[in-house]
Amino acid sequence: MAQTLSFNGRRRVRKFFGKIPEVAEMPNLIEVQKASYDQFLMVEEPKGGRPDEGLQAVFKSVFPITDFSGASMLEFVSYEFEPPKFDVDECRQRDLTYAAPLKVTLRLIVFDIDEDTGAKSIKDIKEQSVYMGDMPLMTNNGTFIVNGTERVIVSQMHRSPGVFFDHDKGKSHSSGKLLFAARVIPYRGSWLDIEFDAKDIVYARIDRRRKIPVTSLLMALGMDGEEILDTFYTKSLYKRDGEGWRIPFKPETLKGAKAITEMVDADTGEVVVEAGKKLTPRLLRQLSDKGLKALKAGDDDLYGNYLAEDIVNYSTGEIYLEAGDEIDEKTLAVILANGFDEIPVLGIDHINVGAYIRNTLSADKNENRQDALFDIYRVMRPGEPPTMESAEAMFNSLFFDAERYDLSAVGRVKMNMRLDLSVEDTVRTLRKDDILAVVKMLVELRDGKGEIDDIDNLGNRRVRSVGELMENQYRLGLLRMERAIKERMSSIEIDTVMPQDLINAKPAAAAVREFFGSSQLSQFMDQVNPLSEITHKRRLSALGPGGLTRERAGFEVRDVHPTHYGRICPIETPEGPNIGLINSLATFARVNKYGFIESPYRRIVDGKVTNDVLYLSAMEEAKYYVAQANAELNADGSFVDEFVVCRHAGEVMLAPRDSMNLMDVSPKQVVSVAAALIPFLENDDANRALMGSNMQRQAVPLLRAEAPFVGTGMEPVVARDSGAAIGARRGGVVDQVDATRIVIRATEDLEAGKSGVDIYRLQKFQRSNQNTCVNQRPLVTVGDVVNRGDILADGPSTDLGDLALGRNALVAFMPWNGYNYEDSILLSERIVADDVFTSIHIEEFEVMARDTKLGPEEITRDIPNVSEEALKNLDEAGIVYIGAEVQPGDILVGKITPKGESPMTPEEKLLRAIFGEKASDVRDTSMRMPPGTYGTIVEVRVFNRHGVEKDERAMAIEREEIERLAKDRDDEQAILDRNVYGRLIDMLRGQVSIAGPKGFKKGTELSNAVVSEYPRSQWWMFAVEDEKVQSELEALRGQYDESKSRLEQRFMDKVEKVQRGDEMPPGVMKMVKVFVAVKRKIQPGDKMAGRHGNKGVVSRIVPVEDMPFLEDGTHVDVVLNPLGVPSRMNVGQILETHLGWACAGMGRQIGELIEAYKANGNIEPLRKTIGDVVGAGPKAEQVHEFDDESVLRLADQWKRGVSIATPVFDGANEGDVNDMLRLAGLKDTGQSTLYDGRTGEQFDRQVTVGYIYMLKLNHLVDDKIHARSIGPYSLVTQQPLGGKAQFGGQRFGEMEVWALEAYGAAYTLQEMLTVKSDDVAGRTKVYEAIVRGDDTFEAGIPESFNVLVKEMRSLGLSVELENTKLDEAQATQLPDAAE
């Protein structure tokens, strides 16, 4: 069947080089942000049925609040959000926060307490909905609008709660001994550390305070010494047997040991093992099989063991020896003397089981629970005398109180996994068994069993996304509020109050505001282009509150870890101090409910790879063998090779194919979005790939976006998910299109309550956060049928729904007169003339008229002492016209400020009396264009305070806005009418009427002609016999009226908002914002780059005729230095050049075939050529089935150059590139003969020429160049400020002074240190001298010297300057320096 190109030929078709089929759908790229915040707010969930997560959990954890006496209680019932006051665009324009009011329903219960029995009965219940401040909402693109600017909350990586075992790598002690430690980290609450010291005693620390023996902690948990030993050691019973002792034979404790003396069977008396023989597992097994039960031992064998129980005389209660005491001759004598013939002994052999806990117990000074509790109390609260109650309460609150200690579900799950427990994840506090299990495992580690944890493993680090960060912040706010509520409940007459009176929501609202405004993780969105937006939202930062700091973070934390595979990109991270601390999520990764990053894998069942996709976190993945995505498969999904490269437990290895459990989904699941946009990434060195992915984020949107010839197939995904290109919300037919909006009549999803019309407003020349230009252009035409998700309009840096960050430029790699030395870039003038790399930047200027002490400032056109020429661009209100061309120093908004009265001379008074006052008491404070900025005014916004009269300009802007809203309403109304009346006439047709408008005959059969005789508004008067149809007519009428009134209401609300005054900062009467569009052509000093980290600065722009040219006379656009490739090892750019050259060659052929088709009407050669280019493969089939119109459209798209996609790690190889070159009729060396543009002579050797996708980066020379004459000075030091933003000067710094000193240039030096810097009096004198035409001046004392003197005085040194003039005689007496 002939296929048509998707809905309007406005979708780029690419030849696809990938060989690995895409099995899993790539998740939405900003899912991380949206899902997390939705889970926090749960707006969609019904009020009563919300699960205990997010905001619900916060309220549940703080409420109910009981007053101190227990006489009343405030309970939480539910919460809901009201619709936000302003929509996203209004908030952007008015500098507001996009937020919805949060209403919480609270229930106040008052109790009657019986004074005798203390029994409570409910006296009164009151319920009320209370306003709890505004909660910021997330926009559809995953951002927040705070005070009118878009911000992003970056996700934070932090150490997961749970238990971690580690050692100090032998650094703590000089012997290099490994000291093991365990740390229990809760989500909130006290940290518990358990650690060994160099003497192998086990200590515990709480919150990194002073250490106490771990046995004290165990005693505080209610254990005694014997119980502690019983928990950690096994017991053996030594029985008296004649002269010696019988000891049980336990082969498991003897493995690998040596028999020091001969071993004798206690039952038979025979020697079973000779002295000095090694006890191998085989030998021990033979002895067990022979039936050896017990060995004979002498007294010597008992010495050095420890008692497992107290040795007590039960009749008198006398304790001879305590559990844990060492057995030596003396103790043995005591035991035998008192007639004990059985001795319980601890199973400590110092080889497999160490005596650490026993040694700790004997070193511990605390004897019982009370001592231990007191000791812990003294550590936690030094200086306070402990009592049993206070000590017990404090100890319980540390780890066992859910209010203060929360492991979180994650912590509990991690703890269960590490310690082999199975506790419900609702148990969020520690238990005695948990602490025991931690100590046991730590001791086992010291005994050499088990492994320590790898803290950088992604199984031990988790992500806190927006929702969770917000939840923690809101909890803090509510806890602050809780204290105030409790106090108020106690102090107020509780019977008469409502919940509203108890609550002051300020702390909660302030916590939210503080988080969005000043948290380290709430960042100003990087909005240079769509890619930088998406990357910013997918960023993971290890910094921030509760995270690492740059200075403390070592090498290991920053390094790439095997578990990053498929979860965090190994390439994209900043260069500089943050390297490795700020990462990017990989393309297919997602964050699970516990906050761990998961990556998708295909299941392998019975040796065959299925399309069943499974998401696993790093912990879960460790046990599987995972094959690479590029492993070769047979048609049935089995592996071709006997041995397959795979990953297992962090190692890469070759393993037999039968052992495989999983397989990667796609080769690009390893890298981030930005890295996946680099073609031939696999041929680039990692350092350059890092620069390439970072520099794509800095590419400025150009005037004309152009998609790359050589892409990777990721481009449409980024354009769609970033929200730069507009996608259709639902299917429909395009009804109207102009530059500012698209109106679509919906054909699907037509619910009763929903409007049947979608209006898409396009952003025109809006300013982004980085001053780049956001502009959207429609792609559809009237009558187009669109489906859901189709691209309707291109945005900044998008071209037919593909991301387009730069332009395809014809590049030659060759030196050119030294102009491409050190990575400089040589450009052709054509690039400037054709606006290839021209971008538009929008600057915003705002001016406020305040109410000052001396009177209000005024925005006006009559400014004192300003010529009419300077006011030519201002309207009668004193505000610049839209479309005016402005340059540095031009007035944008005229403003005058009243100035203080100065005393007048009698003459002035006379003149004032004669000519009237006014002119002199104001000064000009107009807003002017800053130096170095030229541009065109594109937008002006005027904001007035409530009750301040609006000027002409404000009224005009308001009228325009209302007209726009009215047009939207009318269009929607027209489409509604057309739909409804169309359906109405269909229903009436063929029916017999029983009533109708005036003058209508009953019983007539209705037809189009009959009905059309009457005006539309009267059609509702027809009634028909068929009752079913009649009821449908009535339902339609109701639906129509409801839609109409809803439309009108929406319009009225918006108009009311427009006409209402604006919220203003205190003291501001009026505010004007002026937006200036600046057109920046490329010029020497601008920074450019390719996608492979090949960056450089434009050194010169050469006339076209001087540039090297090809045999057909085409001049190259860019000349790059060939020496930039070998040492940098980014060979991807060369492959891109060749492939781009082939694409352009094919494009030329297609262009010629289009001309041929126009001449002879035969489309077959064109179809064949396009078929040859596309080749075979899954993505190619649809192109082969295109109808003629679609083939022509595609050819038109491809005539400048064929679009191809070469996915990362699965792209075109050298053979493919050669095939493409041959297909295009070019040499497969990819080189061409070039001629020198200036002499016309041929260059000696062939030159590599081709197309590279070049980007212009947001480092423009216009933003950096800066000059200053007189400007602002620092108040204290009186030296000029620094930097362009402050209009500062160049610093003649310390090293420059040394240079002058070295040259002995005394006068220049004096000048630099005084009159040209901070000698205030000297500066004025120089100025006066220059004005007089005199060139003598005197240097005084620099201000910085005075500052130094003041600082010395502040340190208590009396420094005085003697101001004496020397006369001739004294001067001659001074010692001569030359002597």
From Swiss-Prot:
Q: Which domain of life is it from?
A: Bacteria
> Which Gene3D superfamilies does the entry link to?
2.40.50.100, 2.40.50.150, 3.90.1100.10, DNA-directed RNA polymerase, beta subunit, external 1 domain, DNA-directed RNA polymerase, subunit 2, domain 6, RNA polymerase alpha subunit dimerisation domain, RNA polymerase Rpb2, domain 2
> GO CC: one term?
DNA-directed RNA polymerase complex
Nucleotidyltransferase among keywords: yes
**UniProt-recorded Gene Ontology molecular function terms:** DNA binding; DNA-directed RNA polymerase activity; ribonucleoside binding
Which segments of the protein form a coiled coil according to its record? none
Q: State the UniProt keywords alphabetically.
A: DNA-directed RNA polymerase, Nucleotidyltransferase, Transcription, Transferase
Biological processes annotated in GO: DNA-templated transcription
Matching Pfam families, A to Z? RNA_pol_Rpb2_1, RNA_pol_Rpb2_2, RNA_pol_Rpb2_3, RNA_pol_Rpb2_45, RNA_pol_Rpb2_6, RNA_pol_Rpb2_7
Please give the start and end residues of each transmembrane region: none
SUPFAM superfamilies named in the record: beta and beta-prime subunits of DNA dependent RNA-polymerase
| EC number(s) stated in the UniProt entry for this protein | 2.7.7.6
Task: Name the catalysed reactions.
Answer: RNA(n) + a ribonucleoside 5'-triphosphate = RNA(n+1) + diphosphate
* Assigned protein family: Belongs to the RNA polymerase beta chain family.
Query: How does the record describe its quaternary structure?
Result: The RNAP catalytic core consists of 2 alpha, 1 beta, 1 beta' and 1 omega subunit. When a sigma factor is associated with the core the holoenzyme is formed, which can initiate transcription.
**What is the stated purpose of this protein?**
DNA-dependent RNA polymerase catalyzes the transcription of DNA into RNA using the four ribonucleoside triphosphates as substrates.
Protein name listed in UniProt? DNA-directed RNA polymerase subunit beta
Q: Which organism is it from?
A: Rhizobium etli (strain ATCC 51251 / DSM 11541 / JCM 21823 / NBRC 15573 / CFN 42)
Q: What is the lineage of its organism?
A: Bacteria, Pseudomonadati, Pseudomonadota, Alphaproteobacteria, Hyphomicrobiales
Which gene holds the coding sequence for this protein? rpoB
